Swiss-Prot record:
It comes from Enterococcus faecalis (strain ATCC 47077 / OG1RF). This is Putative regulatory protein PrgT. Induction: By pheromone. The gene is prgT. Might be involved in the expression of prgA, but is not required for activation of the expression of prgB. The keyword Transcription regulation applies. Keywords: Plasmid, Transcription, Transcription regulation. It comes from the Bacteria.
Length: 101
């Protein structure tokens, strides 16, 4: 997936959203399904792009330096959500309030 393809998908998605401001209210329409499909394609393409420049070594080095998760995401120039996905995809445990021990 290239940035050009992502740009085309974004434009199509925005055009569909602009044609009907209430598109999200009816999940059974073709418009809703197409918007969801485009959003997933864009997200998947973005995930592939960022994962190619994140290395386990750099991630672990940032952790050893004491950086918080949000700060590590900023170092990689990605969102915390994207870093969480990479984290999960690479076999790191996902901690939340209930299992931090």
């Amino acid at each position: 997936m290239t940035k050009k393809e992502q740009s085309i998908w974004r434009k199509e998605m925005l055009a569909l959203m602009n044609e009907d401001a209430d598109w999200y209210r009816n999940e059974d329409t073709e418009r809703f399904k197409r918007i969801q499909e485009l959003a997933k394609k864009i997200e998947t393409a973005s995930t592939r792009q960022f994962s190619s420049h994140i290395s386990k070594e750099r991630f672990e080095a940032y952790q050893r330096m004491g950086l918080q998760f949000k700060e590590i995401a900023e170092e990689f120039h990605i969102t915390t959500t994207a870093l969480q996905q990479w984290h999960k995809d690479n076999g790191y445990p996902i901690y939340n309030k209930n299992n931090r021990k």
